[in-house]
């Protein structure tokens, strides 16, 4: 892929063109994930997976609505560099909620990308902060900055004992799953240590990009304590899905178009069990986005 041309004459006075280029990558990451097919239990070009309330067009409309908010996360990240990183999240929340409202308006109330608003919002704010501080913008630095933003998040939001537990608190208390919050606070280790190196290695070997991304999704599904899956199928459902993904990888993964038959079968099994690995889908979006981040010249 050729680098995305930006060529600012003076980066300090032309950040907006850079922000738009990075936002375009994040938008493309959302589209790349939902169009990827076949995906076990997830909405794709072939079916709606284990979902009865959403379809492909909902995701396209959602991504378009979110797209316009992404530069605002970057602008906020750039505007608060004097704040300690752990103080940034409080200011990001109103932006995230407004972005969610735009998503819900676009989809008539369907939650298509709430997890991605959280992860991409964090990473876009990290881009703004690092750019303003003249620090390297790369997968590792972005994830480390996002982790700094989220310092103490799981303790504050998952370990407190409310009378009415949220879904995330319930899954944490019952199964020890920290979900999107825990992954962000840890600096996205499933992406940095596993999915991103795996995806890059497959591309370096000449693997078809779509097959490489499907194989990377399987890797994430095999490792991720996906709260979306656990909320639908409990510990047993999560364990089954992780094991099925691991078996497919052990058998060679998705190397050729002929291997797609195994994914079609896995998809039908997930639909029958009403399991949808939405958390892994969100991490796949992060993986693709970070894999492309160097394409923007800055």
UniProtKB/Swiss-Prot annotation:
InterPro entries: CitG, TriPribosyl-deP-CoA_syn_CitG
GO biological process, one term: prosthetic group biosynthetic process
UniProt KW keywords: ATP-binding, Nucleotide-binding, Transferase
Database matches in Pfam families: CitG
GO MF annotation list: ATP binding; triphosphoribosyl-dephospho-CoA synthase activity
Top-level class of the enzyme under EC nomenclature: transferase
E.C. code: 2.4.2.52
Superkingdom of the organism of origin: Bacteria
Record has Nucleotide-binding as a keyword: yes
Catalytic activity reported: 3'-dephospho-CoA + ATP = 2'-(5''-triphospho-alpha-D-ribosyl)-3'-dephospho-CoA + adenine
HAMAP family per UniProt: CitG
NCBIfam families linked to this entry: citrate_citG (TIGR03125), PRK10096.1 (NF007503)
Recorded family membership: Belongs to the CitG/MdcB family.
Protein name: Probable 2-(5''-triphosphoribosyl)-3'-dephosphocoenzyme-A synthase 2
Name of the coding gene: citG2
